């Protein structure tokens, strides 16, 4: 079974392809009907949008190919990895912080998700409960104690998990 991010990217790709193949041709045809294309702002806007969409479609196709090699079965069940919810304690302040490790496309700081390629994300990868990790952040070195790890496999489907 593929990762949830792959399914979301495929939906986004389908939306962009629909706009590129159905909506934009109609907008371009309508703009052409207005006459001189050299001074036609509608036509220029549609052509610009077409270029942007083509680039986005290519980027999404590449990312889907890259991520499609991973399956849920490859995600560890016993340590921090993609999709894990990790509670850490800041060694300096004693503050408890929960992070969810995700791919860069899924980052939502307001929801507590961080990229697996961020300094903290990289430091937490493959850690288990009880581990101590020191990471270099833009604000300096930080040490965290891993309090709990809930892997992607242990989470309800609506909260990032999928049955494997």
Regions found by a protein language model. Give the residues of each.
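Non-DNA-binding regulatory cores of transcription-related proteins
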Residues: 71-156, 162-164
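N-terminal intrinsically disordered, low-complexity, charge/repeat-rich segments that act as generic
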Residues: 1-70
């Amino acid at each position: 079974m593929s990762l949830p991010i792959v399914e979301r990217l495929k939906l986004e790709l389908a939306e962009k392809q629909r706009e590129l193949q159905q909506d934009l041709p109609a907008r371009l045809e309508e703009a052409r009907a207005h006459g001189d294309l050299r001074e036609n702002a509608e036509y220029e806007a549609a052509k610009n949008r077409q270029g942007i969409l083509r680039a986005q479609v290519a980027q999404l196709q590449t990312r889907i190919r890259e991520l499609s090699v991973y399956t849920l079965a490859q995600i560890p069940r016993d340590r921090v990895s993609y999709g894990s919810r990790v509670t850490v304690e800041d060694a300096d302040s004693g503050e408890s912080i929960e992070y969810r490790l995700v791919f860069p496309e899924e980052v939502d700081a307001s929801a507590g998700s961080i990229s697996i390629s961020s300094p903290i994300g990289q430091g937490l990868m493959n850690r288990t409960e009880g581990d101590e990790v020191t990471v270099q952040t833009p604000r300096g070195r930080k040490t965290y104690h891993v309090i709990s790890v809930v892997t992607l496999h242990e989470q309800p489907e609506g909260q990032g998990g999928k049955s494997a």
